[in-house]
């Protein structure tokens, strides 16, 4: 899942970004509201976390622009102000949730999970490819009924492949989504993690799901053995 995080306190921005990446999210982070709005215009996100008090453009203004543009991206607002009027203003502007600083990282993670579950809906939380299932709500992966334990990065890669089942994804797209890298070529991080996933997902199964498309990238699809 791809998350936008906008927070002008650099230390907090770095801390939260590291936490979300460790949990398997792809994260674009920025330090002011104008950058946040630029990101939101350029890409679709599974959720956005916006601080209210930011330079150039405050979080409420970003949120209003987002809703005026017809985008339904789930938004969690962050603020140091706990006044009821501030909460009402945020919710009236289209926020899905509201978190007051200082907050525990565990609470932020829990609220983000609720937001992303709500976006996909209870009936859409399971991604399926053959006998492979991934539950985005519980973050559990099974193949043939057997549970598969994945690292946070392996999970993020598999989720991206399954969301794009049948679509060939270039190394550049995978790096940008899963690692938040600006692709420069020469790195083999995608190939390494594809090998990790194949060992856990495909080894021991006659029907392989993760395929290499020479010169193009990788695709997850069902093929007859």
Predicted segments, located by residue:
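N-terminal/domain-start alpha-helical segments
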Residues: 1-122
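Glycine-rich nucleotide-binding loop
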Residues: 35, 215-219
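Conserved A-loop
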Residues: 54, 136, 143
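Residue-level signal for beta-strand positions within conserved beta-sheet cores that form or flank
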Residues: 71, 123, 130, 206, ...
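CheY-like receiver
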Residues: 119-138
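Positively charged, aromatic-enriched patches within helix-turn-helix-type DNA-binding elements
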Residues: 140, 145-209, 214-216
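Intrinsically disordered, low-complexity protein-interaction/activation regions
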Residues: 222-225
